[in-house]
C-alpha cells in the first residue's frame, strides 16, 4: 500500500531572526497544510534546507512534525545524506520517532556509481523497516539513478516502495515504470510535470507549490484520479507561470519569499542561500496574483 496518494508538500523550514528553527511557525504551517487538504508532509527535504541543518536539528524538526501532525496525515522524513552512515542514523531516528516513511536523496557531491548507489540504499534500508522513497534529482546532486538501478533496488530491497522523480526526463520516468512493472509508487518531483507523470502511472507529487497553494495541488491530483483529465490538465497549465517563478532562483529561495509575501513570516534562509532579487520578486508577486494566491 502506498504511503500516500495525491499531493505531498515538501515543506519549508521557517527560521527565526537568529536562524534557529521557528517551531511555533512550523506548527502553524503544518496546521494550514492539513486544513488545505495536503495528503502528506515531507519534512527536512531540499525545500526544508536540510543541507544546512545539523543532525540534531534534523532529528528534532522531524520529531516535532511527527508529534504535531499526530497521524492525521502521513509524515515522511527526509533522511538522505551523502554519507551512508549519517543517512542510516537519521533514518533510524525517524523510524523510532514514528515517521510513516523516509525520503532518500541520492548522495550529493560524491558522485557514486550505480553500484555505489545500490550499496548505499541497501545499507540504509537494511537498518530500518519503514517504507523508503528514493529521490532522483541529478541537477542538484550531480548523481542520477538510472532506471535499471531503480528496478534492481525495488526488486531486491523490500521496503523501497517508491521514487520521487525530479530528473525532468519523461523518458526516464517511463523506463522506471516499465522496468518496475507496477511495483513502485512514482511521485513527480517537479511541479510542472505533475499531470504528465500521473498520465504515465504516477500516484502523486512531492510539491514545492503546495507550500503556497495546498488545496490547488491536491485538487489537481484528485481531478485526475476522478477522471476529470481536462480539468486537471487546465490546472497544471494555469499554474505554470507561478511554478516557473518559484524556480527562477534556486529552491527554496522563491518559495520562502512567496510565503513571506503572503504574511506567513517564515523568515530568511541559511547561508549560502540569499534573499531573492527584487526583480524576481516582482515576477513572483504577479504570478501569485494571477493565480489568486495574493
What are these model-derived regions, one by one?
Residues 6-14, 36-38, 199, 206-294:
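C-terminal alpha-helical cap/extension of soluble enzyme domains
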Residues 136-137, 159-160, 270-271:
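Glycine-rich phosphate-binding "P-loop"
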Amino acid at each position: 500500500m502506498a504511503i500516500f496518494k495525491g499531493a505531498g508538500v515538501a515543506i519549508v523550514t521557517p527560521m527565526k531572526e537568529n536562524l534557529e528553527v521557528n517551531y511555533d511557525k512550523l506548527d502553524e504551517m503544518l496546521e494550514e497544510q492539513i486544513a488545505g487538504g495536503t495528503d502528506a508532509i515531507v519534512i527536512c527535504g531540499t525545500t526544508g534546507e536540510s543541507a544546512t541543518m545539523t543532525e540534531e536539528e534534523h532529528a528534532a524538526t522531524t520529531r516535532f512534525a511527527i508529534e504535531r501532525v499526530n497521524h492525521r496525515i502521513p509524515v515522511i522524513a527526509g533522511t538522505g545524506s551523502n554519507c551512508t552512515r549519517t543517512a542510516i542514523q537519521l533514518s533510524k531516528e525517524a523510524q523510532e520517532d514514528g515517521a510513516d516513511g523516509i525520503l532518500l536523496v541520492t548522495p550529493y557531491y560524491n558522485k557514486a556509481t550505480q553500484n555505489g548507489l545500490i550499496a548505499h540504499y541497501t545499507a540504509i534500508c537494511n537498518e530500518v523497516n519503514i517504507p523508503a522513497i528514493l529521490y532522483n534529482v541529478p541537477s542538484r546532486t550531480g548523481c542520477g539513478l538510472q532506471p535499471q538501478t531503480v528496478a534492481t533496488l525495488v526488486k531486491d530491497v523490500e521496503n523501497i516502495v517508491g521514487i520521487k522523480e525530479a530528473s525532468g526526463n519523461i523518458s526516464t520516468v517511463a523506463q522506471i515504470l516499465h522496468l518496475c512493472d507496477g511495483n513502485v509508487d512514482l511521485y513527480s518531483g517537479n511541479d510542472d510535470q505533475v499531470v504528465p507523470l500521473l498520465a504515465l502511472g504516477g500516484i502523486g507529487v512531492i510539491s514545492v507549490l503546495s507550500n503556497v497553494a495546498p488545496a490547488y495541488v491536491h485538487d489537481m491530483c484528485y481531478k485526475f484520479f476522478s477522471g476529470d483529465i481536462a480539468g486537471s490538465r487546465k490546472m497544471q497549465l494555469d499554474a505554470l507561470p507561478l511554478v516557473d517563478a518559484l524556480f527562477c532562483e534556486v529552491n527554496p529561495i522563491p518559495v520562502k519569499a512567496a510565503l513571506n509575501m503572503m504574511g506567513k513570516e517564515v523568515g530568511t534562509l541559511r547561508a549560502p542561500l540569499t534573499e531573492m532579487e527584487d526583480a524576481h520578486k516582482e515576477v513572483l508577486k504577479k504570478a501569485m496574483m494571477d493565480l489568486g494566491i495574493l
